Amino acid sequence: RRLVEKDHPSNVEFPGYFKGAVFQGAMTGADAFFFPSYEETEGIVVLEALAGHQHVVLRDIPVYHGWVDDQSAELCHSVDEFVDSLEKVLSGQVDKRDAGYRVAQSRSIDLVADQLVKAYQQVLEM
């Protein structure tokens, strides 16, 4: 908690500690969304970053397989890869924001709801 509240560079923000319009502004106004976590349950925060047209730099972990790939985000395995990816993103050498946004669109709540309705209809027809 001390790191989040005091001991970090002034250009670093921790999204879990602000909400609403402030969160939306941070997600759309940041230079990049950097999420090096070893664990993630569903990837909702990543989906939010993709929907906000962010440059996304992630650790390549299984929860993202099948929906986030190297076309839509920078996927890394080591500190050196994270440094390299962040440098490429921040210097403008790579820009995967449009592809990332398409991933977010493909997982929109409306599309997911339609899929759920179809699944229920199939079960009812059995």
Language-model features, listed with the residues they occupy:
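Short glycine/serine-rich donor-binding loops of glycosyltransferases
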Residues: G43-V46
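Short hydrophobic beta-strand element within catalytic cores of glycosyltransferases
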Residues: A51, H55-L58
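Short alpha-helical donor nucleotide-sugar binding micro-motif in glycosyltransferases
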Residues: Y17-F18, G25-A30
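Aromatic "clamp/platform" in nucleotide-sugar-dependent glycosyltransferases that forms part
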Residues: Y38
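A charged, aromatic-enriched C-terminal amphipathic alpha-helix characteristic of glycosyltransferases
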Residues: V94-L124
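Nucleotide-activated donor-binding/catalytic signature segment of Leloir-type glycosyltransferases, i.e.
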Residues: R1-F18
